[in-house]
């Protein structure tokens, strides 16, 4: 996930990582968002959709919450079974066949969320690096500013060039950051 993934892995602890991901999730998807809440002894990552996604809704929530669970396990070293996932939809027909590979999951709940012990929030991350976390967060800020600045392609390119420090990116790099091919960028 580019600088966002690098930044998340480099944060000092899980709480910082979740807050960084929460702030910049729009760099990866505009369909979903999530927020961190505390309820008693539990930390809760509540997921929501920003747009109607129709038939993809269940798939998107499954993908997001299972990905966050696996990522959290990877960066902390905690067991994937240390928490539980809640979904607001009925148990899918395939669940029993994959249940043994997944963390505890509860269906027909009020919200789509990942729940785990609050104490995990302060746990140091395996790959914590404050310098890398700062640099990655700064790059994410630049990417977000670029994304929000305009839908006008020439304006986005100018903004991107003005944010560079000491060099100009190649055409392919600019196109990649704008999520298009170099050929499409030239036409626009």
Where are these regions (language model features)?
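N-terminal low-complexity or simple alpha-helical regulatory segments
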Residues: 1-42
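Short hinge/gating elements
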Residues: 2-8, 50-54, 121-122, 140-143
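Short capping loops/turns at secondary-structure boundaries
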Residues: 7-10, 14, 53-61, 78, ...
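Short secondary-structure junctions and interdomain/linker hinges
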Residues: 11, 28-32, 75, 143-147, ...
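Short, highly charged low-complexity linear segments
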Residues: 14-15, 37-39, 77-88, 123-132, ...
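Internal, well-ordered alpha-helical segments in soluble enzyme and binding-protein domains
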Residues: 17, 64-67, 132
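DNA-contacting interfaces and partner/effector-binding or oligomerization modules
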Residues: 32-33, 37-121
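Extended mid-to-C-terminal alpha-helical interaction segments
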Residues: 92, 99-188
């Amino acid at each position: 996930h580019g600088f966002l993934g690098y930044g998340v892995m480099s944060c000092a602890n899980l709480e910082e990582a979740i807050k960084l991901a929460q702030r910049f999730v729009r760099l990866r998807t505009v369909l979903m968002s999530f927020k961190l809440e505390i309820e008693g002894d539990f930390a809760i990552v509540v997921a929501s959709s920003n747009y109607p996604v129709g038939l993809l809704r269940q798939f998107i929530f499954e993908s997001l919450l299972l990905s966050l669970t696996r990522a959290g396990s990877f960066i902390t070293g905690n067991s994937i079974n240390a928490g539980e996932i809640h979904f607001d939809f009925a148990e899918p027909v395939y669940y029993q066949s994959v249940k043994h590979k997944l963390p505890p999951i509860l269906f027909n709940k009020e919200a789509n969320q990942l729940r785990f012990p609050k104490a995990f929030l302060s746990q140091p991350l395996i790959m914590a690096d404050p310098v890398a976390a700062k640099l990655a967060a700064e790059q994410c800020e630049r990417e977000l500013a670029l994304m929000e600045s305009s839908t006008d392609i020439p304006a986005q390119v100018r903004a991107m060039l003005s944010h560079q420090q000491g060099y100009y990116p190649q055409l392919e790099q600019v196109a990649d950051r704008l999520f298009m091919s170099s050929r499409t960028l030239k036409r626009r």
